[in-house]
Curated annotation (Swiss-Prot):
Its main location: cytoplasm. The lineage of its organism: Bacteria, Bacillati, Bacillota, Bacilli, Bacillales. Involved in peptide bond synthesis. Stimulates efficient translation and peptide-bond synthesis on native or reconstituted 70S ribosomes in vitro. Probably functions indirectly by altering the affinity of the ribosome for aminoacyl-tRNA, thus increasing their reactivity as acceptors for peptidyl transferase. This is Elongation factor P. GO terms for cellular component: cytoplasm. It comes from the Bacteria. GO terms for molecular function: translation elongation factor activity. The gene is efp.
Length: 185
């Protein structure tokens, strides 16, 4: 059991018969009444996001998540195959389980596969990935003064807003948490 006062971003807990990951939390001490913790939780099974309020000092069960390093091998229809780097055991996941992460997955990429009590919940990609621009409008000289952006389609199919100086074929650093451009690689 863990106290809600000890919440940290990324902590996994068991609440209401579900496995939840703490995305955000805030300790609130109103002038009148008892303190409480307002939190934003993501269900690791369904991906649903829920806001929940706990009384300060309330105890919740900590979920012990197994985190295995695996390599993304290939996609075949709606099935995506991963391989454990130590045992060479292969694992297949459905598109619905890793829909968001697919925007960042390239073949042979190292990822963390998370599971709870032998049930695979999903995939955790690195915070940043390097992806190549496959389609974008050419930058026109003089456009940079405004500091604007233009859409660019990356090799995984993800479309992000990038500065005007980015061209087709450039490799970019992309933040996987916000699906946004960070810098050139």
């Amino acid at each position: 059991m863990i106290s809600v006062n000890d919440f940290k971003t990324g902590l996994t807990i068991e609440v209401d018969n579900g496995i939840w990951q703490v995305m955000e939390f805030q300790h609130v001490k109103p002038g009148k009444g008892a303190a409480f913790v307002r939190s934003k939780l993501r269900n690791l099974r369904t991906g649903a996001i829920q806001e929940k309020t706990f009384r300060a000092g309330e105890k919740v069960a900590k979920a012990h998540i197994e985190n295995r390093r695996m390599q993304y091998l290939y996609a075949s229809g709606d099935t995506h195959t991963f391989m454990d780097n130590e045992t060479y055991e292969q694992l297949e996941l459905q598109t619905a389980q890793i829909e968001y992460e697919l925007k960042f997955l390239k073949e042979n990429m190292e990822v963390h596969v998370i599971s709870y009590e032998s049930e695979t919940l999903g995939v955790e990609v690195p915070n940043t990935v390097i992806l190549e621009v496959v389609e974008t409008e050419p930058g026109i000289k003089g456009d940079t003064a405004s500091g604007g952006t233009k859409p660019a389609t990356l090799e995984t199919g993800l479309t992000v807003q990038v500065p005007f100086f980015v061209n087709q074929g450039d490799k970019l650093v992309i933040d996987t948490r916000s699906a946004s451009y960070v810098s050139r690689a």
